[in-house]
Regions:
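Nuclease catalytic cores that cleave nucleic-acid phosphodiester bonds
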Residues: 8, 12-155
Length: 155
């Protein structure tokens, strides 16, 4: 006689929450869907939320990033702006999305990592380090993220 054990794995949304502009949107939508949320941030980005579990890590160059990667599992959704975090989360079987609604996939992560490396090398070569920063976030940006995120939640 064989016994088949079905293990139910619940998806969790894990947010690399240091300076993430879509924490509230993702948390609200996850709550509607009944999906747990974990927000990971360092001590300089304290969050308060009645639904999400907040993981506060020490300040450090990769503390939050490594916690996100170590926490995620196959089937989870990871929200991050960091290509390195996305690459490691994808390797663990997580689905990854950035704050603009772009999906990180096995098909695009290598080229994104290569572009990041090239841009970093160019910045090191240049004596001018004038970084403009991201453009101001709009309601359309939030809507684009929301649409893509809902699509991931419903997979």
């Amino acid at each position: 006689m064989y016994v088949i054990i079905h293990r139910v794995i619940q998806m969790t949304v894990i947010i690399d929450a240091d300076a993430c502009p879509v924490v509230k949107i993702a948390t609200a939508e996850s709550k509607k869907a009944g999906v747990p949320v974990i927000c990971v941030c360092d001590t300089s980005h304290i969050l308060n939320d009645g639904y999400a579990r907040i993981m506060i890590v020490d300040k450090g160059s990769n503390s939050a990033d490594l916690t996100v990667v170590n926490t995620c599992q196959k089937g989870d959704i990871v929200i991050t702006q960091d290509y390195g975090v996305a690459s490691m989360a994808l390797a663990k079987g997580a689905k990854c999305i950035n704050q603009n609604g772009m999906y990180y996939t096995e098909d695009n992560i290598d080229s994104l990592m290569a572009m990041r490396h090239i841009a970093s090398a160019e910045r090191r070569k240049s004596s001018k380090h004038h970084l403009k920063g991201p453009k101001k976030r709009t309601a359309e940006d939030d809507e684009k993220f929301l649409k893509a995120f809902i699509s991931l939640l419903n997979i």
